[in-house]
């Protein structure tokens, strides 16, 4: 009675199979130090072997390679007693711990390190602690002792003693894991035995011995089916329970939503909970389908091996001897075809489940705001799944045809056997004897009816086989069409990706050019700001420079008014001479600003008429001052006789004449506001002209216009710069007060680009859904036809 198995496993604890394996030697390194704050030893253990392997694998982290903890002196003694019990040779290796350490740790009386730790030294003074050198020597001895213990008792044992792991023991495992492991092991053992029996077919030299092997093989296959069913049913049970719980909870929530009067928040929470239960139920269904596929894979693998081995055995025997084993071969073919058909149906369910998931993802894309490339990717995945589904359906039709062909061969064999039967009758010498043979004749007629029934069954099987062939041809055509669409979608995806890369490269080049232009603009602005600051600093240091410029300019203008060309030239020379002393007085000690000085004269191509290029006044004064500093003063020159009038000069180009006119105007009629502003870096000659100013042909016209008071100059309003502390709204209001005309914006029914992209996305999703549904509908049309194996059960 004691040897019988218990009815329940309550109170039993499963142990691991590899509970006492051969220990692997690891190199351990122990570090011991005294922690004066806690009054305990700090112990650290490093597994150098595991660290070296982790470093070779280039894995991050240090989990499982190092351990650390604190031990009191009493705890060290207890660990030593445990290790010495395992290995008695370790007893004399433990160094003696001084009693002062026990007093420092407070473990001798069990008082802890709380309030008593403050009162105890006042009542009973403790002996002096050992010195640092003694503690360091003691720690080194403990490290050596732990190293010896790891060599004698094993590193795992020392780690478990020093650093006990919290939780359950590692020697036990859960009941569910134990049951699953046991069932899997039994299934593997049965499959191994079946494989060994298949290998023993060559030892059977006679048909009688081979039939015994076949009988043993059938028994092992039935045992394999039983173990596989038990194992996979155990795997299926949690997912079935989850499916039932999720379905019942979902139905309860839907019933509550339909019947109860709930608020909007409660309704939203219940809907979210219902969707979560729906997701869990779908996950459970998917897991059930995957486990079912694995079960049929096991049975199909076993039957395939049995059929192949039997077909090899058929080659060793003749037709007459093999006739006894022929029914078993036909039965194996039928079983293999049926199991393969079940496997294909399970795969079909898995593929349809995946296809439905992709369709739901496509439907959820508008709410998630995904892009068009995600739609294309999901559609391509749907095409791939549909192609796999077509392959599965073709395999199902092939197995159905195999079943029909096997049945058809069996029926034809029966018909042949019936037709080959020969009935012998005794001769009759009288009518009475002939009447006595009537039952035998009726039996013969019954055999003919059986032959007719077999013939009709053969015709039905042929008709079903023809329908299967037509369905297979239709599926192949649809598969080819689906493959063409798949290739087309792949080409479109590649083209769009190529276009995206090309556009991206172009956009990168544009961004690079814009970035370079922005850097160049920033550099120009920075240099301009530096130049303006230098000019402003120069004007602040030389305030008399501008008054001298005004005086010289006014004198030169007055001297130029009554004369002609020769007087203008003399006045210009006099202007240079009079400007030199003033500038030499004011700007002799000031550093010269950085400005480009143009040459005073340029020769035309004919070489006859000199063309003067006017230089800004500041540059003239600076150049004059430098000449006055370097040369001694000269006596005044005697008056020269008037030269003969030169030939009239050719007309100047418009740009040069306008530049000269603008220069004279700026020299003569410069206001105080314009003098205070710094000069720009790049001078634009046409910036100061009015739009209707054509530019005079010579200086006489300029002087005549000045005499008549018709100077084509207009007052330029200086823009008032806003205060740095003013906000944007105040600047806008100030601009409105100055008379800025605001344009009325007409809000038209323009197309929002975001809405346009959303509409494009929705349209693409709708078209993709239509294509997916069309492809799925093409494959689902074949499910309406009855399966030819229904009658086979």
Curated annotation (Swiss-Prot):
Residues 632-654 have a biased composition (Pro residues). Residues 778-787 have a biased composition (Acidic residues). Its main location: cytoplasm. Residues 618-628 have a biased composition (Polar residues). The N-terminal region associates with membranes, the coiled-coil region binds to microtubules and the WH2 domains promotes actin nucleation. Interacts with ACTR3; indicative for an association with the ARP2/3 complex. Associates with microtubules; in vitro binds to tubulin heterodimer in a 1:1 stoichiometry; decorates microtubules with a repeat of 80 A along protofilaments. Interacts with RHOD (in GTP-bound form). This is WASP homolog-associated protein with actin, membranes and microtubules. It comes from Mus musculus.
